[in-house]
């Protein structure tokens, strides 16, 4: 049992697992921010453009069940905005990484044979 706990601790404290945990927490917080942006800023403007339509209240009844398709539309808008924001973030991040990875142009090192030939020629001239 102790060995299993040690293995679990080692697994849980690896960089990748901690990075994933931090990413999940930040992602959840980011999702709340985007949902607030969509619900409180974007959708009211869309509603005004569409004649005062409030998407969150859109629904219809089937028997005793209520189908709230307005909430579904709201979720789709949330998803599109979150996906676009992540796309932009990844695109910017990869452009920074590519800039850092671009090798600096180094002067080509002459091959060893060329040096040897030059040394040979210099030695021949000195012997004359």
UniProtKB/Swiss-Prot annotation:
PROSITE patterns: MSCL. It is a multi-pass membrane protein. Keywords: Cell membrane, Ion channel, Ion transport, Membrane, Transmembrane, Transmembrane helix, Transport. The keyword Ribonucleoprotein does not apply. GO terms for molecular function: mechanosensitive monoatomic ion channel activity. The chain crosses the membrane at residues 11-31, 70-90. InterPro entries: Mechanosensitive_channel_CS, MS_channel, MSC/AndL, MscL_channel. One of its GO terms (cellular component) is plasma membrane. Its main location: membrane. It comes from the Bacteria. It is found in: Cell membrane. Channel that opens in response to stretch forces in the membrane lipid bilayer. May participate in the regulation of osmotic pressure changes within the cell. Belongs to the MscL family. Homopentamer. This is Large-conductance mechanosensitive channel. The lineage of its organism: Bacteria, Bacillati, Bacillota, Bacilli, Bacillales. The gene is mscL.
